[in-house]
Amino acid sequence: MRSRSNSGVRLDSYARLVQQTILCHQNPVTGLLPASYDQKDAWVRDNVYSILAVWGLGLAYRKNADRDEDKAKAYELEQSVVKLMRGLLHCMIRQVDKVESFKYSQSTKDSLHAKYNTKTCATVVGDDQWGHLQLDATSVYLLFLAQMTASGLHIIHSLDEVNFIQNLVFYIEAAYKTADFGIWERGDKTNQGISELNASSVGMAKAALEALDELDLFGVKGGPQSVIHVLADEVQHCQSILNSLLPRASTSKEVDASLLSVISFPAFAVEDSKLVEITKQEIITKLQGRYGCCRFLRDGYKTPKEDPNRLYYEPAELKLFENIECEWPLFWTYFILDGVFSGNAEQVQEYREALEAVLIKGKNGVPLLPELYSVPPDKVDEEYQNPHTVDRVPMGKLPHMWGQSLYILGSLMAEGFLAPGEIDPLNRRFSTVPKPDVVVQVSILAETEEIKAILKDKGINVETIAEVYPIRVQPARILSHIYSSLGCNNRMKLSGRPYRHMGVLGTSKLYDIRKTIFTFTPQFIDQQQFYLALDNKMIVEMLRTDLSYLCSRWRMTGQPTITFPISQTMLDEDGTSLNSSILAALRKMQDGYFGGARIQTGKLSEFLTTSCCTHLSFMDPGPEGKLYSEDYDDNYDELESGDWMDGYNSTSTARCGDEVARYLDHLLAHTAPHPKLAPASQKGGLNRFRAAVQTTCDLMSLVTKAKELHVQNVHMYLPTKLFQASRPSLNLLDSSHPSQEDQVPTVRVEVHLPRDQSGEVDFQALVLQLKETSSLQEQADILYMLYTMKGPDWDTELYEEGSATVRELLTELYGKVGKIRHWGLIRYISGILRKKVEALDEACTDLLSHQKHLTVGLPPEPREKTISAPLPYEALTRLIEEACEGDMNISILTQEIMVYLAMYMRTQPGLFAEMFRLRIGLIIQVMATELAHSLRCSAEEATEGLMNLSPSAMKNLLHHILSGKEFGVERSVRPTDSNVSPAISIHEIGAVGATKTERTGIMQLKSEIKQVEFRRLSISTESQPNGGHSLGADLMSPSFLSPGTSVTPSSGSFPGHHTSKDSRQGQWQRRRRLDGALNRVPIGFYQKVWKVLQKCHGLSVEGFVLPSSTTREMTPGEIKFSVHVESVLNRVPQPEYRQLLVEAILVLTMLADIEIHSIGSIIAVEKIVHIANDLFLQEQKTLGADDIMLAKDPASGICTLLYDSAPSGRFGTMTYLSKAAATYVQEFLPHSICAMQ
């Protein structure tokens, strides 16, 4: 018999430690571990972490086996791990109905439970009796399921279980937009059951998704059916949100020690090494103590000041927990593991020694790791005064199995029994290693032979869609439908993946479906979804964005491949040449660079060997039967004649026997419109409407047609007015100016509706006119009246065979209008159809997840609706319609702006610095205002032009508003002199950092608006011979530009085209209006407000108080505090007035820095502003200013000249605000300071 080696003896000692502290508690039937002797429930997260020591020890025995008994011991340990993992699987699979429901609802009531009965795997508390939604717990289970499977363990035994795991992937893939209760089961730190977005959950979900992607759950014994599929776009959503959250942990926790599990073992979810180090140092600096780390600041758990009889905390109570938070040795085990994986031996040694000092020796000298160390009740005051000086006492579970397990695992690795690669077989530890440069492969395809010839004339040789066969080309929406079959299991009542928008990472791969290669075109060129794809310049911008995104986010094997089809809509109006924007983009891609990305153009067949290709094994024939329903319509050749897919579908009859081809053709046939209207004539309709860029609704045409048809009560059928509050009343019978702004508009037209013999309305007259007219505008007018009077599903019986509902006809008309790029009419029909961005909820989520709250509608509340958490698609669109008061035009424009904001958030996040709330209603308002100012035109002309802008021009205008570069003003923390606000400086700014399109954007806008004005005048003279007038003002009135006030010279009206004035006049007022509308504040503003609240009882803004008690609940760096401050400031409807209030608060922060105890009780900030205004008026009058120069804004009572004053200088706003603040608070200041003032 061989003698036992030293390593074997040491392993035996760890085996005894594992047995005595962990395995002795494992249930022999279920394999689950109870939390402690007193708490018999099994928590999912704790169980996974607690078994890691057993898994590691088993790997160590297998690696260092001296004899057969060691191999047997390794097998025994590994099977204990399998038993626990399968026990947890049984617990969760019993709740399969919740998994199915949660995929669609993301509701806390539909979530998997966080803990189960150790003996039976049953649930132990009700759905609403615990914070069950903890995505990090489900994610850590999936992460280690992947790691353990990769290490050789066989945990999953059947395809039913594979499908369940696939659905768990769908369960966690929305973690980036799902607020949960987090790793500490508390949600918001007030412990009141408020869920929030947690970085620990997002990071762990991201790690689990990456680990499971393309993993065979049967290991080496598996096949295609047991492979898990993950969509790369969902992973990157998590990555993006995680990067934006860190080093913060959530909205209520500015830092949390649980982030150690995200930036290091086990998740390794962060790819930016600098961000990893920043987060790590934040934890060490703010949370580390003598016995471990606090979980987060002001954590009251098991502190002497916590009331054990009460589950929740009062908000102001959190201040009591400051500096006495319990310290957890658990987190030092993470630092040990981090040191091992990073190769930092010094860190490993330091924390091992520190941990040894806080371990408690149990029976027979067994080292036990306590749950936490708490301040003794009699030493609380001493700890308050001198943090980290009082000796603490151990409390809670002993041992804390989670911490005990990681302590043993860290010791095994530190002593060399395990290498990092053995405990991390999927190589997640290399996440921060720089990735190779990405070259995006672009295959340009022509829809038809004619387009191919046009491209060839330009020196661009391409293939047609038909010529790439047997490679098959499909639109992105088809890939979304295909993925909806993934994970489907009828026996378990699992429906598969919910239908969702397909991102660019998903469409940039090739797909192997039943031995046939498929490629999918990007989502943004699908013209059936939203009208952005009808604008060729917008297509180029979206292509540029996607290419840039691919270069920074692509992490898969192989290069990304974009299939870019050139369709008929990308040609000029005559159809003989390529649109200049598209041609320029193609030439740049051929040159090798576009949008900052390296490009390789070529044929699809040339890219087969270098592309990333995924085998969609779930599309193979399986136990679930066929891919499609037997009752679908086999007539799949009815695609629209203008659809770019025609080149591909021409071969469809040759492959009717192919089930996949029939399935895909079925999807195409049911997602494409079928033409039913008569084609537009070239003479009477198309050419005229090409030239006629009119108002969004072209209400005049509607009324004219109503007169011809003798329609009564036309006002009942007109589109709802844009933000009806404070709207002018218009009389359509004459051209008088608007009057009585506060009245709801009415229309009085004395006409008669045709009736049949029985006296009923004869709608057949309308339908007959619809059939005969070739004018697109007239068709829209008639369909709108039918839509409002008969409903969208009314069958017009336009043709004998088949139905022709109003909705179907409007959809077809939308396609026709799109071809002539009539943007006002496009938006109008989109509004009628309630046509929404398919990825609207994703755009909203992108913004929210970057900690930007959204509001829709115009202030004040309750009209302005706040969106502070991700919403399901339908709920989001309902909220937008409600906020827009049913106005379909503004509803559709709000969605459009939301998409553009999300685009800029992904590509230029710096535009949104120090902005926590994006008020889309105000942004639309300020866009119209700025357009009027830039073009020196009236508000009516500007608002009409805004609704007729192309999407690309609208996006450029938004960039102009966000960047503010035209004004040569920016926010800065370094003042140019002592009197300047620390947040504002003036200097010349170039166009560095903007794209060429954005640099020339405003010039294009001016040109486009001038054309709109010319066409509007032409239409008013040609199309309205009866003296009618254009109703541009009816869509977006002056009251929309300045809510609550009329547009007068004192409130921001703009001169006409021929008025000249000093370009500097109005510059600062415009700057303040922009910053106020965008909620932009100086750097560090919210932290300074927190300090001010420490010196007073609160700040009052327009009667709404921000109390000082807020600081007892929230810390300075919390997002929650920033949002709370924003909610008070947003009570002010006028952007420029709001910005003056911000400047006044900045002055108060300077006073708060003085060494005094208090600067007042409740400080009325608006009063300080009005005192400053009075001082300004007095001084201006002494200098000879007259009443006209010193006109006041009627809404706020502030002199417009003060709004337009620079912050610095003798007459600067900061000068007067400083004097006003000193005057207001002087009674609270020491006499010596008052004398200095």
From Swiss-Prot:
PTM entry text: Phosphorylation of Ser-1018 by PKA stimulates the dephosphorylation of the beta subunit and, thus, reverses the initial stimulation of PHK by the faster beta-subunit phosphorylation by PKA, that occurs in muscle in response to adrenaline.
Compartments (UniProt record): Cell membrane
Tissue expression per record: Isoform 1 predominates in muscle, heart, brain and testis. Isoforms 1 and 2 are expressed in similar quantities in the other tissues. Isoform 3 is highly expressed in slow muscle and heart.
Organism the protein comes from: Oryctolagus cuniculus (Rabbit)
The organism's taxonomic lineage, starting at the top: Eukaryota, Metazoa, Chordata, Craniata, Vertebrata
Family classification: Belongs to the phosphorylase b kinase regulatory chain family.
Site feature (Not methylated) residues: C1234
Keywords of the record: Calmodulin-binding, Carbohydrate metabolism, Cell membrane, Glycogen metabolism, Lipoprotein, Membrane, Muscle protein, Phosphoprotein, Prenylation
Gene Ontology molecular functions: calmodulin binding
Pathway named in the protein's UniProt entry: Glycan biosynthesis; glycogen metabolism
Activation/inhibition comment: By phosphorylation of various serine residues and by calcium.
InterPro entries: 6-hairpin_glycosidase_sf (IPR008928), 6hp_glycosidase-like_sf (IPR012341), GH15-like (IPR011613), KPBA/B_C (IPR045583), PHK_A/B_su (IPR008734)
Full protein name: Phosphorylase b kinase regulatory subunit alpha, skeletal muscle isoform
Composition skew (Low complexity), residue ranges: 1042-1056
Function (record text): Phosphorylase b kinase catalyzes the phosphorylation of serine in certain substrates, including troponin I. The alpha chain may bind calmodulin.
GO BP annotation list: glycogen metabolic process
Lipidation (S-farnesyl cysteine): C1234
Membrane topology: Lipid-anchor
Sites of Phosphoserine modification: S629, S729, S735, S758, S972, S981, S985, S1007, S1018, S1020, S1023, S1030, S1127
